[in-house]
Amino acid sequence: MKNSPKSKQQASSSKIKVKSLFLINDDYNSFDHVVDCLTAICDHDEIQAEQCALLTHYKGSCEIVIGDATDLEPIKEDLALYGLNVEIL
């Protein structure tokens, strides 16, 4: 018996909706504080955290984590507790 491939419509409806957690620039958190939070909470390594902090500073925002909205919500709450401005889009 041969399995028939799913149609494109069926495949797209069964996918998990991927969301992104964005770090938004602000004027009150220090660069080091942002890097420390990203390494501790988002499991970024030092270089990745520094790059995200720089991109956020110069571009206004940076995508820091990708995943399902239910997985991103606790990360968002933890970062917000440390004073970072984050948003799930």
What are these regions (language model features)?
Residues 1-89:
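Terminal domain-initiation and capping elements
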